[in-house]
From Swiss-Prot:
Transmembrane segments: none annotated. This is Aspartate 1-decarboxylase. It catalyses: L-aspartate + H(+) = beta-alanine + CO2. The gene is panD. It comes from Chlorobium phaeobacteroides (strain BS1). Substrate binds at residues 57, 73-75. Its main location: cytoplasm. Heterooctamer of four alpha and four beta subunits. Binds 1 pyruvoyl group covalently per subunit.
Amino acid sequence: MRVHLLKSKIHNAVVTSGDLQYEGSITIDSELLDLANMIPNEKVLCVNNNNGERFETYIIEGKAGSREIQLNGAAARCALPGDEIIIMTFAEIEAREAKSFKPMILIVDKHNNPKRRHLVGEEDNPL
């Protein structure tokens, strides 16, 4: 049996812009992707901390160091620039491995600069 678990999360990301006319997706700074163990085209679940809205989309890699979190297409209707969101990816894992699996958590500041990074259940690593 396989179970669906949190794989990684960018916590407290701030939406920097939106492009309603784009085909869809969320553009994320490539440095943040690397730190959070996320990859381009990966499906994400986003939660808007300002209004409670939840939406799914996929990742587009943004420019390294830009600290960009841009919502594209219909997702741009779900959060406005300045809104704080949580970006999560999930993985299917064999049930016998699930108890030892540890998701990666990246916490960013209000400018999307990485603050801390850790595996769930392990000590924070300030960045």
